[in-house]
Amino acid sequence: MVNEKTSTDQLVRRFIEDLGVTYEEQGSSNIQIKQALRSASKSKSQSGVGKPEFIFFSGNHLIIVEDKLAIDKLEYKNNDGIIDTEFPFRRDYAVNGAVHYARHIIEKTNSYKEVIAIGIAGDGLHYQIHPYFVSETELKKLPEMKSLEDISPENIEEFYKVAVLGELPKEERELREVNKIAADMHEDLRNYGQLEGEKKATVVSAILLALEEPTFSLNQLIGSDRVGGTDGEIIFNAVRVYLENAGIVPYAKVGEMLDQFIFIQRDVTLNTVNSNLEMTPLKYFATTLEAEIMDKIKSNTDFDILGNFYGEFVKYGGNDGNPLGIVLTPRHITSLMAELIGINKSDFVLDPACGTGAFLISAMNRMLGQAENDDERRDIKQNRLYGIEIQQKLFTIATTNMILRGDGKSNLIRDNCLTFDNTIMNGYGINKILMNPPYSQAKNDQTQHLSELSFIQQALEMLVVGGKLCAIVPQSTMVGKNRHDKARKKQILKQHTLETVITLNKDTFHGVGVNPCIVIFKAGIKHPENKRVSFVNFEDDGHVVRKHVGLVGDGTEKGKREHLLAVLAGDEDDGTDLIVKTAIKDTDEWLHSFYYFNDGIPSEDDFYKTVANYLTFQFDMTANGKGYLFEGVEENE
C-alpha cells in the first residue's frame, strides 16, 4: 500500500529539489531553530521535540512544509474560519502542523519573526498546496500554488511583495507607469491639441518615428509659422526621410503611412505656441515622449507600449471603444501563447490580424532571447516576423511598433486576411501563427464568413505543412452549435489537426465580457481519428481582479504557468480537473468542461460556482450572436 513516505513526501521532496535549495527533514541544524523546536511536538503535551517534515531557506525567508496523503487532511478551520493549532488538529492536518511549528519558531527565536508555512496534501496526480504567512501578529492565507516555483530564490522576493505585502507585480507596476503617462498624454492631446479619436495615436506614432531620424532634433521645433517651417512640417519631413531611408518594402507602404500623418503639418492648434506651455503642443508632446517613452520601447521588452497607449486613448469613447471589436490581448497571454507553440529564433512567424502588433512583439522578444550574435538578431527583426492588418489606424501603429523595434524594417501588409492570397505567405515559409481574431462579427447568415473559425481556417492555409497555429478566441467558438460552425469544424479536421484547447481565466479580458480559450492546431495534416487532444482548465492561472486596478498577478502566476507548460510537455502529471486527453469528434464541444467528469459530491460552493459559470457562459454565447441556442428549451424537452 502506498504511504506518505513514498508518495506525498516524495512529491514534496521533488518540488523542493527543483528549487535548488538546501533542505532538511524532521528537524534543523540551525542553532536557534533547533532550540525552538525542542518543546514544539505536535503531541497533546507538546513535551517532545518538534519535527517539521521539511524546512529550508529561500533567500532570507524561512519555509516550513508539512504534508499529508489524504487531501481532506490538508487544513482544518474552526467555526470562526481560523486555522486551529490545538491538538489534535496540529497533528492531523498539514497546514495546522506547519503553522504550529512556525509560531513556535517565531516565539522562541530572536532572528525569525516571519515564516511561510505550507501545507501539502495528496499525491502526484491529485494534490493541493496551501501556503500561509505567519508573523507575531498575523496569519495570512496566501494564494494556492501548483508547485513551489514561486518561492524559489529567484522569485521569492517578488512573491513576498505581491502575495504578502499586497504590492502590485513588477509587470503591473510597469504597466501602470506607462498607462499613467498615456492617460496624461491623452489629456494633453485633448486639452492642448484639441485632438479626439484615432488622431491621438497617429500623432504619437509620427513623433516617435521622427525621433528615430538622425537629422531631427527637438531644438528644430521653434514654433515658426512660416510655410515649410512649422513644427508639424519639420516632424512630418523627419518621418518621411526616416521611412524613405529605412528600406521598407513595398515602397507604397511609406505613402500609406505618410497619408496618415499629413494633417500634422498644418493643424493650427498643434503648430501654434501655447502660452501655458511656452512652446507648441507638438514640441511639448515630442519632449514628453522622448523623455518618458522612447527608451522603454527600445528596451527589448515584450510590453506593447504603443498598443497600451492606443488602448488608453480609445477607452474614453467613440467607435474605437467598442469592447468586442478591438480587444488588446494581455501581455501575459501573448507571451504564454508564444511559448505554447515553442516559437524559436529559426521560425517565420505571422499574425494575420495583428492589430497593434502585440503578438509579434512577444514573438520577437522570445526569439531575440535565443539569438547568439548580432547577425541572428538582425535576421530575426528584418526577415522572420510578418503581420496583416486591415484597419489603417492599427496598421500605422503596428508598423511604427515594428519599425522602432526592428532596425527600421517592418514586414506588415495592410490587407484583409480573409481574402489575402495564401500563396504569398506560403512563399515566406510561415511555420508559426499567433492570432486574436476579431471578435463578435458573425451575427447572421450574411456575416458568418466573419466568424472566429473562419479566420482560423483561412490562417491555417497560410502555414507550411506541420506548422503551428495558436489563437485566442471566445469559448463559444469551440462549441459549434450552428450549421456554419459545425461545417467549419468538420472541414478543419479534414485538413488540419487539433492539438490543444486551454480554457482561460474568465477575467482575462476584464471588463469586456468574453470568456476566452486558447486553441492550438497543426496545419496540413488531417486529424487522426484516434488522436488524443489535450483539453485544459487553466482558469486558476494566478491572476485576480483587484478593485480599482484590474487584472493582476497574485504572486503564484509564474509557478502555475510553468506547471501548465510542464504538464502539456509530459514532464509533470496532474488530475483530470486540470487536463483531459481524449479523442474527439467534430460535433463535440471542444472544451475541457465537455470532456471532464467529476464524480465527487459537490459542495454548496461548487453548486453556486457551477450555476454562475453557466450563466456567464450563456451571456458569452448571447454576446457572440448565439443567444438563440437558449430559446425554446422547455418546448424541446
From Swiss-Prot:
GO biological process: one example: DNA restriction-modification system
Enzyme Commission code(s) on record: 3.1.21.4, 2.1.1.72
Annotated InterPro entries: DNA_Adenine_Mtase (IPR051537), DNA_methylase_A-5 (IPR003356), DNA_methylase_N6_adenine_CS (IPR002052), SAM-dependent_MTases_sf (IPR029063)
Keywords of the record: DNA-binding, Endonuclease, Hydrolase, Magnesium, Methyltransferase, Multifunctional enzyme, Nuclease, Restriction system, S-adenosyl-L-methionine, Transferase
Means of activity regulation: DNA restriction requires S-adenosyl-L-methionine and Mg(2+), and is inhibited by S-adenosyl-homocysteine. SAM may be a cofactor for DNA restriction.
Listed Pfam families: N6_Mtase
Function (record text): A B, G, H and S subtype restriction enzyme that recognizes the double-stranded sequence 5'-CGAN(6)TGC-3' and cleaves bilaterally and symmetrically 10 base pairs upstream and 12 base pairs downstream of the sequence to release a 34-base pair fragment. Methylation of the recognition sequence occurs on the adenine in either one or both strands; seems to methylate restricted DNA. This subunit has no methylation or DNA restriction activity on its own.
Known partners and oligomeric status: Heterotrimer of two A and one B subunit. Both subunits are necessary for DNA-binding, which is sequence non-specific.
Name by which UniProt lists this protein: Type II restriction enzyme and methyltransferase RM.BcgI
Gene: bcgIA
